[in-house]
Regions:
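Ribonuclease/tRNase effector modules and their secretory precursors
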Residues: 1-124
Length: 124
């Protein structure tokens, strides 16, 4: 398990108002999942996970207590998406906010998400 950062809880209340912890982690199992399902992506996006969570461009609606976080890294044009599961008071107390998956996305996919998914948060 690796800690990525602490959330700005107010920013992420658009997913759920019930956020008892700030800590965001990614487990070794989830890292392996990303490597298996999106070969070559983890090594490219890992340095930007903290930035994406701290300063997302968009947070989109997903499953309950889960958001799709979109971030463009302007110095290299990388667009990344990550799936963030928010820990709520109904979850086991030892759980944390966690990155479920993450990968690079293309500009057409990015635009498709913005057209077809509900935008919960947009950076200014």
């Amino acid at each position: 398990m690796k800690k990525i950062c602490d959330l700005d809880v107010e920013k992420y209340r658009c997913i759920t108002p019930d956020i008892p912890t700030k800590e965001v982690i990614i487990t070794d199992e989830r890292i392996q999942h990303i490597k298996n399902h999106h070969p070559g992506h983890f090594e490219v996006i890992e340095p930007y996970l903290k930035t994406a969570l701290e300063a997302p461009d968009y947070i989109l609606e997903d499953a309950p207590n889960t958001g799709l976080v979109l971030k463009t890294i302007y110095e290299n044009g990388l667009r990344l998406q990550l799936v963030l599961r928010i820990h709520t008071s109904a979850d086991s107390p030892e759980f944390k906010n966690s990155v479920i998956s993450a990968w690079k996305i293309s500009e057409p996919r990015w635009n498709n998400y913005l057209r077809n998914k509900k935008i919960l948060y947009k950076s200014e």
